């Protein structure tokens, strides 16, 4: 008399046969311990990780960030109050060459009082230019004030030290009475004015357009020197419309519609998979090589770097300027944009042909022009500026947060 065996019973018998020393059990335990215990414990405070516990930490971290920004704003204010004035005739660093190689144009409006965003930005640029020394003698700081009100205290203070272009100085502008001109279009027009002023005033080789809440990273000048003098001599980079120096960290994950990210992600698996397989085989005393084990570790490493956060692994590239990557740009955002002079002139023409509105800001306008005009643009990774402005100049935000 034969008896039938249920699938559940067969599965149970197979599981019983598995010993703690079997490869399948060991890899299963590794997966559970890594993704269920170790990674969540290690990464629950990492802002750009999938393991980040938003409800536990976001409010506190946002408040701490704002308090720190206030302190740094006060420090930047004292920094300039203690510097000798240059009466606005030359930059406080030194007199740049008659035709600068790079003009650093900081676009500023009057923002939330107390944070002194633009002072933080300019003071950091000043420190870095001093550290850079003779290598940066062809760099020129330039402030572009697009605030309609005359009460922009920080811009007035900086005019003692840095050359300033004031868009609305001595003009009767009826922008506020024109219902067809919205804040997004005005921001684009301000951008065009500042870019054009930079070209007309200095006729440089490059213009770096920096918004007044984008603080430069320590490595910005060595990296730009390497990129512009070495990497951008390559044919596919030479005629780029612009190079972005910032992309939001929250948008830097691998799971993204950009093909280059997917290729990079697969590359991570192809690199770490064999390495982790070799380590496992060595310490587990397994003979030979196993393709299934390598496939497991490839997927394991790909999942780990994505869930922990690609942003944090990109930071390893800061070890050397040559490790920074240049990849095709996406549409968001414009805190820091580098334009070669010929491309800057093309950009002025392009932007004069588009009208910005809510949902179609200047960043989207610039990105849309790439396909329409057959242009190319790139972004450098990791970021070369830090975005510190939680208070937008376009949108009212009474409860700012880091996400």
Swiss-Prot record:
UniProt remark on domains: Contains three transmembrane domains, including a tandem transmembrane domain insertion into its glycosyltransferase-A fold. Transmembrane domain 1 functions as a signal for Golgi targeting. The conserved DXD motif is involved in enzyme activity.
UniProt record, GO biological process: GPI anchor biosynthetic process
Residue numbers covered by motif DXD motif: 211-213
TM ranges: 23-43, 260-280, 288-308
Documented effect of changing residue 87 to A: Loss of glycosylation. Not glycosylated. Glycosylated
Family statement drawn from the similarity comment of this UniProt entry: Belongs to the PGAP4 family.
Keyword list, A-Z: Disulfide bond, Glycoprotein, Golgi apparatus, Membrane, Transferase, Transmembrane, Transmembrane helix
Protein name per its UniProtKB record: GPI-N-acetylgalactosamine transferase PGAP4
GO CC term (a single one): Golgi membrane
Membrane topology recorded in Swiss-Prot or TrEMBL: Multi-pass membrane protein
Function: Golgi-resident glycosylphosphatidylinositol (GPI)-N-acetylgalactosamine transferase that catalyzes the N-acetyl-beta-D-galactosamine transfer from an UDP-N-acetyl-alpha-D-galactosamine to the 4-OH-position of the first mannose of the glycosylphosphatidylinositol (GPI) of a GPI-anchored protein (GPI-AP). This modification occurs after the fatty acid remodeling step of the GPI-anchor maturation.
UniProt modification remark: Glycosylated.
Topological domain spans for side Cytoplasmic: 1-22, 281-287
Entry's localization field: Golgi apparatus membrane
Positions bearing carbohydrate: 87
EC nos: 2.4.1.-
GO MF annotations in UniProt: glycosyltransferase activity
Gene coding for it: PGAP4
Positions with a binding annotation for UDP-N-acetyl-alpha-D-galactosamine: 109, 334-335, 362
Top-level lineage group: Eukaryota
Known outcome of mutating residue 270 to A: No effect on GPI-GalNAc transferase activity. No effect on Golgi apparatus membrane location
Lineage: Eukaryota, Metazoa, Chordata, Craniata, Vertebrata
Top-rank EC class of the record's enzyme: transferase
Disulfide feature: 132-136, 144-194, 332-333
InterPro entries: PGAP4 (IPR029675)
Lumenal side: 44-259, 309-403
């Amino acid at each position: 008399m034969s008896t039938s065996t249920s699938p559940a019973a067969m599965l149970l018998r197979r599981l019983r046969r598995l010993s703690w020393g079997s490869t399948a059990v060991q890899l299963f335990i590794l997966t559970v311990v890594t993704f269920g215990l170790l990674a969540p414990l290690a990464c629950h405070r990492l802002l750009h990780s999938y393991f980040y516990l938003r409800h536990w930490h976001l409010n506190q971290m946002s408040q701490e960030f704002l308090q720190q920004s206030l302190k740094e704003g006060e420090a930047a204010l004292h920094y300039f109050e203690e510097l000798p004035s240059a009466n606005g005739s030359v930059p406080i660093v030194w007199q740049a060459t008659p035709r600068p190689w790079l003009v650093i144009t900081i676009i500023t409006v009057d923002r939330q009082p107390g944070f002194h965003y633009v002072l933080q930005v300019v003071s950091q640029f000043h420190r870095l230019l001093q550290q850079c020394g003779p290598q940066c003698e062809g760099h020129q700081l330039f402030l572009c004030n697009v605030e309609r009100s005359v009460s922009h205290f920080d811009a007035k203070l900086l005019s003692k030290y840095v050359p300033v272009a004031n868009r609305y100085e001595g003009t009767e502008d009826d922008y506020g009475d024109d219902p067809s001109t919205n804040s997004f279009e005005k921001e684009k027009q301000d951008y065009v004015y500042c870019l054009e002023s930079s070209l007309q005033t200095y006729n440089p080789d490059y213009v770096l357009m920096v918004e007044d809440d984008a603080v430069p990273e320590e490595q910005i000048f060595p990296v730009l020197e390497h990129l512009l003098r070495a990497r951008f001599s390559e044919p596919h980079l030479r005629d780029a419309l612009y190079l972005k120096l910032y992309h939001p960290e929250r948008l830097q994950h691998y799971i993204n519609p950009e093909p280059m990210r997917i290729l990079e992600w697969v590359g991570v698996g192809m690199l770490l998979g064999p390495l982790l397989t070799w380590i496992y085989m060595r310490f587990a005393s397994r003979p030979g090589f196993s393709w299934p084990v390598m496939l497991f570790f490839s997927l394991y490493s790909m999942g780990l770097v994505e869930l922990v956060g690609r942003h944090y692994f990109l930071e390893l590239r800061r070890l050397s300027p040559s490790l920074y990557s240049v990849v095709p740009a996406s549409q968001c955002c414009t805190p820091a944009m580098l334009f070669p002079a010929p491309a800057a002139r093309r950009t002025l023409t392009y932007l004069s042909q588009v009208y910005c509105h809510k949902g179609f800001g200047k960043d989207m306008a610039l990105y849309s022009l790439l396909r329409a005009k057959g242009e190319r643009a790139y972004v450098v990774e990791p970021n070369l500026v830090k975005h510190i402005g939680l208070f937008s100049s376009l949108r009212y935000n009474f409860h700012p947060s880091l996400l």
